[in-house]
From Swiss-Prot:
Induction: Expressed in the late phase of the viral replicative cycle. Expression of late genes is activated by the viral late transcription activator C. Disruption phenotype: No tail is synthesized. The keyword Cytoplasm does not apply. It comes from Escherichia phage Mu (Bacteriophage Mu). Keywords: Host cytoplasm, Late protein, Viral baseplate protein, Viral release from host cell, Viral tail assembly, Viral tail protein, Virion. This is Baseplate protein gp47. One of its GO terms (cellular component) is virus tail, baseplate.
Length: 360
């Protein structure tokens, strides 16, 4: 039975009744009497104790605990919160002659995000050169798409001010949210480490900054092979870039456990393939009444949530799941999902995604 702390008013009444039973005829309900003040004071103290007991009860269970207490649960189970990381990647610069680009040289994106060169680069010819730069500030904002223009903040001799991120920057991630941390903790408790089974690979992949969901395919290409794929839901494009795939593959191959300090990772003799899934959009066609902007947004959110929670590479999506998601939105007088009408399936290398909804 759930614990429900008594209200202050009920505690006051209970205390007054106790006084009345001990001192018949004392009438502690009279506000001008000393006994009434004592009853109020005692009830207030008791209310504070009950509220604290209620708070302690919430902290015992990770899913209801405050963030600070959730971190304590995570420490106990060996789950460390992923900290913010800075994006980095190759930047193509153009020089008019041989030159040296000193460490600390900075370039700026149009929206003000700044990137810095870690080590001095000596260039012995004119032309284009690829260098590696890192965002000054850690976080998701540092990730940059392909062919983005950056501009030198401080001019360097013989270096053209405009530079291009031909391959884009990746690796930037914000500090892990409490919800994502709780999800990883629950996974750790429900699927404890087991020497390299499929759940270990999922857990390892999700320990990498930016990774939110991951899947493992045992016997990917036969015995002794494993396939691992993942997505990064906090990005506008959730599908990982080659640099992200490389980071996850390196981490799974072997890494220092963040809690124990021991080297852990894939067992010897296992051939692991880490890959980025391909998007396979599902574009629903839905009739709703009334057709308001608010209902459209609510239905879109419900469908996106359903895709997040229920789809996986190599899985199937029944039309009834979309119908159930739409039916859960309040305010609809009528609706009909006219596509899909058949089960949507994906290969192990594909992930079904919520595409563009056509409103009828």
């Amino acid at each position: 039975m759930a614990y429900s702390p008594p209200t202050l008013s009920s505690l006051i009444a209970r205390t007054e009744q106790n006084i009345e039973q001990r001192l018949p005829g004392s009438w502690p309900q009279a506000r001008e009497k000393t006994l009434s003040a004592i009853a109020y004071a005692q009830a207030g103290l008791a209310a504070g104790c009950h509220e604290h007991i209620s708070w302690v009860g919430r902290q015992i269970i990770p899913s209801t605990a405050d963030e600070d207490e959730l971190l304590e649960h995570c420490r106990f189970w060996g789950v460390r919160r992923k900290q913010a990381t800075a994006a980095s990647g190759p930047l193509t610069v153009t020089t008019s002659a041989a030159t040296t680009i000193p460490a600390g040289t900075r370039w700026q994106r149009a929206d003000g995000v700044v990137y810095s060169l870690a080590d001095t680069i000596v260039i012995d010819r004119a032309g284009t050169t690829e260098i590696t730069v890192t965002a000054l500030a850690a976080g998701e904002a540092g990730n940059t798409g392909e062919n983005t223009l950056l501009t030198l903040i401080t001019p360097v001799a013989c270096v053209v001010s405009d530079a291009i991120t031909v391959k884009g920057f990746s690796g930037g991630a914000d500090i892990e949210s409490a919800a994502e941390l709780l999800s990883r903790l629950e996974y750790r408790v429900q699927y404890p480490p087991f020497g390299g089974n499929q759940f270990d690979y999922v857990r390892w992949a999700r320990e990498v900054s930016g990774v939110t969901r991951a899947w493992c395919f045992p016997t990917w290409k036969g015995g002794g092979t494993v396939g691992v794929t993942f997505v990064m839901d906090n990005r506008s494009n959730i599908f990982p870039q080659p640099a992200d795939v490389e980071r996850v593959a390196d981490y799974i191959a072997g890494h220092t456990d963040p809690i124990t300090g021991l080297i852990v990772g894939q067992p010897d003799g296992v051939n692991v393939t880490v890959f980025a899934p391909k998007a396979k959009p599902v574009n629903p066609r839905i009739y709703i009444s009334p057709k308001t902007a608010e209902l459209k947004q609510a239905i879109t959110n419900a469908i996106n949530t359903m895709f997040f929670n229920e789809v996986m590479p190599g899985g199937a999506l029944a039309p009834s799941r979309i119908i159930r998601a739409v039916a859960g939105v309040t305010g609809l007088d009528d609706f009909e999902v006219r596509f899909p009408t058949e089960i949507q399936r994906s290969e192990n290398t594909e992930l079904l995604t919520a595409g563009t909804i056509e409103w009828l």
